[in-house]
Swiss-Prot record:
The lineage of its organism: Bacteria, Bacillati, Actinomycetota, Actinomycetes, Pseudonocardiales. This is Mycothiol acetyltransferase. Transmembrane segments: none annotated. It is an enzyme of class 2 (transferase). HAMAP family: MshD. The keyword Repeat applies. Catalyzes the transfer of acetyl from acetyl-CoA to desacetylmycothiol (Cys-GlcN-Ins) to form mycothiol. Pfam families: Acetyltransf_1 (PF00583). It comes from Saccharomonospora viridis (strain ATCC 15386 / DSM 43017 / JCM 3036 / CCUG 5913 / NBRC 12207 / NCIMB 9602 / P101).
Length: 306
């Protein structure tokens, strides 16, 4: 017997149950990035949560989970993530989860991480269209030259200072990513919360200042711990966010910032560097390919009614 429970928030016991499911999925799929303790990953924060149980009473087991972000992306579209426990797949739970989410969602977007054929078949069955691709690109730091960055005249690089630079970074972010469904919503509060994460490293957060001392760009790097089922089981660096103020674009600042971060990650001993880029951002993809990056994964977002 299958039962669904919707919740606006998860109590401690439910968080533990969901974490166990996510960790099991990570062991099989390499995703999502979830820690054995602490808060759930950001993509599962906020309302609403859907828990799918198999069995009754004390014997009921959590076999599936969905997070429905009813707050929506920057364009008012609700976004869902669906995960079925690896030990309970191919039993109709994924279909049932999707049906339940669709009954409660409006203008829905659903992520499929890894562009799995089963997800494509399920999307076709429910009339969902392939609306967005997010490419995961990777490069070997040992095989690339990555020369010293050449900055535009009057621009200098320095690293982020916590408690001082938040407003300046968010101002650039807002202008650089006004088109982006997620990054455009990143604010000072979120940046301060990120600084409490174990992976945050101000020494890997590069800022570009112009001659007047105004921040006109940034490159925020990130280091992921080893994941046995992803990227060869080794720690990897990430070109997390590169943002350039539109007024400072066109002079090579974006490439210079990217190179500064890449060289920093290599100096930290990371043999592999990854990044995420929109599949339709041809200019950025071309730049990354020249820097030695190749596409290794594709995430797909399916859309309801478009």
């Amino acid at each position: 017997m299958r039962n669904f429970v919707w919740a606006e928030e998860l109590d401690a016991d439910r968080i533990d149950d969901v974490r166990a499911l996510l960790l099991a999925a990570r062991e099989t799929d390499g995703r999502p990035e979830v820690e054995p303790d602490g808060p759930l990953p950001g993509e599962f924060s906020g309302p609403r949560h859907l828990l799918c149980f198999s069995g009754e009473g004390a014997a009921a087991e959590l076999v599936g989970y969905a997070h429905l972000d009813v707050r929506g992306d920057a364009f008012g579209r609700q976004v869902a993530e669906l995960i079925v426990h690896p030990a309970h797949r191919r039993r109709g739970h994924g279909t049932a989860l999707l049906e339940e989410v669709l009954r409660h969602a409006d203008r829905l977007r659903i992520w499929s991480h890894g562009d799995h054929p089963a997800a494509a078949r399920l999307a076709e069955r429910f009339g969902l269209s392939r609306a967005r691709e997010l490419l995961v690109m990777s490069a070997s730091s040992a095989e690339q030259e990555w020369p010293k960055p050449r900055l535009p005249e009057g621009v200098r690089l320095r690293t982020f200072v916590p408690g001082q630079d938040e407003e300046a970074v968010i101002a650039v972010n807002a202008r650089a990513f006004d088109w982006h469904p997620e990054q455009s919503q990143f604010d000072v509060k979120a940046l301060r919360e990120a600084q409490r994460e174990s992976w945050f490293d101000a020494d890997g957060f590069f800022l570009a200042e112009n001659a007047e001392g105004r921040v006109v760009g940034f490159h925020w790097t990130k280091v992921h711990p080893a994941n046995p089922n992803r990227f060869g089981g080794r720690p990897v660096g990430e070109v997390y966010v590169v943002g350039v103020d539109p007024d400072a674009q066109g002079g090579g600042l974006g490439k210079a910032l990217t190179l500064a971060g890449l060289r920093h990650l290599r100096q930290r001993g990371l043999e592999q560097v990854i990044l995420y880029v929109e599949g339709d951002n041809a200019p950025a993809i071309a730049v990354y390919r020249k820097l030695g990056f190749e596409t290794v994964e594709t995430d797909v977002q399916y859309a309801q009614g478009s």
